[in-house]
Amino acid sequence: MAALRRRSDRSAGLSFDADLGDRALTTARHDIVIGRWQGVRDLLRATGDHWPLRTHRIRALANAAAGSSVVEAWRAAEPDNPDAAVLRAATEVTRVFNGAIAAGHGAGTDRDRIDVAVMACLAAADARPGDPTPWASLLTVVRLYEGGVARSELRAWWEELRRRDPYHLEGHVQMLRYFSARWHGTHGSMYDFARDAAGAAPAGSPLPVLVQIARVEEYRYVSDAAKGRPVRGFGQHWNHELAVTELLRTYDRWLGGRVPGPIRAEEAAELNYLAHAACCAGLTREGAALVGLLGERIALVPWVYTGDPAQQIGRWRGGAPPS
């Protein structure tokens, strides 16, 4: 991935910012690199209960902290700080996923290790009762259990998240992945979940983009299974009639109802999915508009699944679709 990033940066003059323009987050992540937790504490305190921004920052901080003991040092210094408990839970989840990735596909994950992360999530939920973030972390890690979890248990945790934020995007994304064919469901169950959530979302909510995220998940699953071989009937995956109709619906409901203004860091990851869908579908107006709206807040995912991210983005810069 690092080699791809370097190659992409040179090929189109683009850079990929893991923090998506959130400079305060960049500073806090640098503190983690040098072993300091105080900047992380101050950042999360300042973030408060802005759930989308908090989720964006917690996720990035957990990725940065997973290979260090900074979170443990913070917990030791301030054992009663609820933000430290929330970040520790997210970090444990990241560590378990990192271990699963290192072990390779089909290797399985030690159940005791998953249990540790689950208990950290539940402890964080107790420490900060109004915060949906620990519940999103919990919904993320439980899909690593072989066979998943009991549907009643999953539903109970899902309702805990929704009581705190009924339109919590990260929580919805994690449930979508749980219901995907890659994990504990099917393409059909994943799309049903995405479409139901999108249909219930208020105007201006990013939740309709769940349908485009589901389309990426299906593409990854089918492509991985094909192992480079052509897949019959898959050539229109991005631009068949339903895909385009749903893409335009997301574009209208999310961006049409959104308060005008620059894209914020906490919106950018999911907006990359919508821009990617428009570009893959060959929608000239929407693709160029979305790439322009993103500006420099380009994420590697999901572009990396369909080729060189910088080359794909570069072809749409300046309003010109790919030839």
Q: What is the predicted function of each stretch?
A:
Residues 236-323:
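Fungal-biased detection of long, low-complexity, Ser/Thr-
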Residues 1-78, 288-323:
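Extreme N-terminal leader/anchor segments
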Residues 82-92, 275:
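Extended, hydrophobic/aromatic-rich amphipathic alpha-helical segments that build helical scaffolds
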Residues 20-23, 116, 153, 269-270:
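Alpha-helix N-cap/N′ positions at the starts of helices
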Residues 205-212, 262-265:
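Alpha-solenoid helical repeat architecture
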Residues 82-83, 132-133, 169, 205, ...:
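Helix-start (N-cap) detector for alpha-helical repeat units in TPR-like alpha-solenoids
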